């Protein structure tokens, strides 16, 4: 047991680095599928649904990582040891998302709403499933998109010709 601490400064460092690993992995899922939002052959809601589904499926396939991620994310330790790195890690995603929203919209708040709801609904599904994972995913997407679409630039929501 003591050997593992040779790789880390202390317990908090070990946990923060474990979170960073999970955070990078989740962000990688988001970014590797983000290009779907540029597919003009699909309407904007469908594009968002594809991206959401990839993220949802990843979370459902990794319940232990999800539980750790959520518990640490909402802890005091996250604020103290990992918040700054987390925000820097997501900076590129914030920038990518800006194109979908008017300048007056706080994109960080929108992304926080998306991720907070996604993670919360995924935790509910992992801990006490009421329906199949795919059905829970559809319901969660509807919940998120119903709010987010009110902030999206209208030109994104209009049918493409």
Residue ranges with predicted function:
Residues 98-147, 151, 155-161:
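Hydrophobic/aromatic-rich alpha-helical bundle segments in the mid-to-C-terminal region
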Residues 25-36, 117-125:
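Solvent-exposed, amphipathic alpha-helical segments
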Residues 8, 71-77:
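Short helix-capping/turn signature of helix-turn-helix
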Residues 1-13, 17:
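Helix-turn-helix
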Residues 24-31, 58-61, 76-102, 108-112:
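Amphipathic alpha-helical packing segments from all-alpha helical-bundle domains
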Residues 15-25:
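Alpha-helical DNA-contacting segments of helix-turn-helix folds
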């Amino acid at each position: 047991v003591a050997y593992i601490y040779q790789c880390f400064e202390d317990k908090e460092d070990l946990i923060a680095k474990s979170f960073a690993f999970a955070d990078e992995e989740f962000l990688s899922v988001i970014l590797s599928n983000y290009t779907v939002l540029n597919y003009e052959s699909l309407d904007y809601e469908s594009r968002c649904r594809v991206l959401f589904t990839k993220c949802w499926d990843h979370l459902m396939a990794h319940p232990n990582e999800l539980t750790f991620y959520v518990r640490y994310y909402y802890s005091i330790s996250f604020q103290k040891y990992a918040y700054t790195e987390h925000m820097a890690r997501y900076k590129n995603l914030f920038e990518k998302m800006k194109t979908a929203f008017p300048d007056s919209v706080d994109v960080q708040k929108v992304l926080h709403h998306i991720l907070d709801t996604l993670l919360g609904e995924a935790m509910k599904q992992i801990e006490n499933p009421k329906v199949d994972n795919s059905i829970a995913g559809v319901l969660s997407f509807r919940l998120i998109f119903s709010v987010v679409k009110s902030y999206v630039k209208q030109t994104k929501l209009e049918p493409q010709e």
